[in-house]
Curated annotation (Swiss-Prot):
Molecular-function GO terms, alphabetical: RNA binding; translation initiation factor activity
UniProt WD repeat ranges: 8-47, 50-89, 144-183, 186-225, 283-324
Keyword presence, Lipid metabolism: no
Keyword set includes Protein biosynthesis: yes
Major subcellular location class: cytoplasm
Protein name stated in the entry: Eukaryotic translation initiation factor 3 subunit I
Gene it is expressed from: eif3i
Locations listed in the record: Cytoplasm
Classification via InterPro entries: eIF3i, WD40/YVTN_repeat-like_dom_sf, WD40_repeat_CS, WD40_repeat_dom_sf, WD40_rpt
Biological process according to GO: cytoplasmic translational initiation; formation of cytoplasmic translation initiation complex; liver development; sprouting angiogenesis; translational initiation
Pfam name, any one: EIF3I
Protein family according to the UniProt entry: Belongs to the eIF-3 subunit I family.
GO annotations of cellular component type: eukaryotic 43S preinitiation complex; eukaryotic 48S preinitiation complex; eukaryotic translation initiation factor 3 complex; eukaryotic translation initiation factor 3 complex, eIF3m
Organism listed in the record: Danio rerio (Zebrafish)
Keyword vocabulary terms for this entry: Cytoplasm, Initiation factor, Protein biosynthesis, Repeat, WD repeat
């Protein structure tokens, strides 16, 4: 399993995303550039230039027409995927931490950080109404006074957004009214990442409390827990196998204050039903910040603190592997 190494960032990777077909891989990092790559051979197709700060999040819509990025330069930007042209600039009072298109690609959401005296807000815009974009007026803006949103993903059918918070809570925010529909508090520390399964029925949350947990996305019922000895930065659900991949390791500033075994930086594979670990993939120098499965389930990618993105194609025997119960 020889990985393809993507070198396009000079700072640590913050998020990677495949488009629906999986032919493109988008990567953003703590530098101002968003990159798009061919996932089959790692060729860089182009960049989206315009941000002036670290880019925290990226998303691409269902038909790969538009790309959305959110940055620490206090803006969320909409791009034409093919040409790299900036279509919209939405300015905020604080850094944009998460962003996403709903299933239709018409509604976007993004959340802002609680910093510099500003509140954390979850904002919804309708791209079909140019007035909202021009006036920079979201049709709903939900204040999150309790604890800031650290990761968010759209729920099934675009009815709500599932958001993970700094205090370990997971909430569903309605896209119609902005109210909290359901909430779950299974994690004890900050949620670093939330990703949904391919059919949007399940979500997996990765947390600083050294676990990743699986929830039913509509009821937020807690289904599974995957335990490790180190903080989990990202977790993803395989679209074809009952497998989960997790990446983590502690933050660079904590390296000297913790025991060395916490600092291991492999990607770890767990069986989704048995909660058993069955494999590890080494490679990154430093923690893994983001993992993502290819939509066909035959490869996965990871982005690290070292600024590299690695695309791993699975060996044939991975697909025949059965875990003995």
């Amino acid at each position: 399993m020889k990985p393809i190494l993507l070198q396009g960032h000079e700072r640590s990777i913050t998020q990677i995303k495949y488009n629906r077909e999986g032919d493109l891989l988008f990567s953003v990092a703590k530098d101002p550039i968003a990159n798009v790559w061919y996932s089959v051979n790692g060729e860089r197709l182009g960049t989206y230039n315009g941000h002036t700060g670290a880019v925290w999040c990226v998303d691409v819509d269902w038909d790969t027409k538009n790309v959305l990025t959110g940055s620490a330069d206090n803006s969320c930007r909409l791009w034409d995927c093919e040409t790299g042209k900036q279509l919209a600039l939405l300015e905020t009072s604080s850094a944009v931490r998460t962003c996403g298109f709903d299933f239709s690609g018409n509604i976007i959401m993004f959340s802002t950080d609680k910093q510099m005296g500003y509140q954390c807000f979850l904002n919804y815009y309708d791209l079909r109404d140019p007035q909202q974009i021009e006036d920079n007026q979201p049709y709903i803006s939900v204040p999150c006074s309790e604890s800031k949103i650290t990761s968010a993903v759209w729920g099934p059918l675009g009815e709500f957004v599932i958001a993970g918070h700094e205090n370990g809570e997971i909430n569903q925010f309605s896209a119609k009214s902005g109210e909290v529909l359901k909430k779950a508090k299974e994690h004890t520390k900050q949620i670093n990442d939330i990703q949904s399964s391919v059919d949007l029925t399940m979500i997996i949350s990765a947390s600083k409390d050294c676990t990743a947990k699986m929830f039913d996305s509509s009821t937020l019922e807690h289904v599974k827990t995957f335990k490790t000895e180190r903080p989990v930065n990202s977790a993803a659900i395989s679209p074809i196998m009952d497998h989960v991949v997790m990446g983590g390791g502690q933050e660079a500033m904590e390296v000297t204050t913790t025991s060395t075994r916490i600092g291991k930086f492999e990607a770890r594979f767990f069986h989704a039903a048995y909660e058993e670990e069955f494999g590890r993939v080494k490679g990154h120098f430093g923690p893994i910040n983001c993992v993502a499965f290819h939509p066909d389930g035959k490869s996965y990618s990871s982005g690290g603190e070292d600024g590299y993105v690695r695309i791993h194609y699975f060996d044939p025997h991975y697909f025949d592997f059965e875990l003995e119960a």
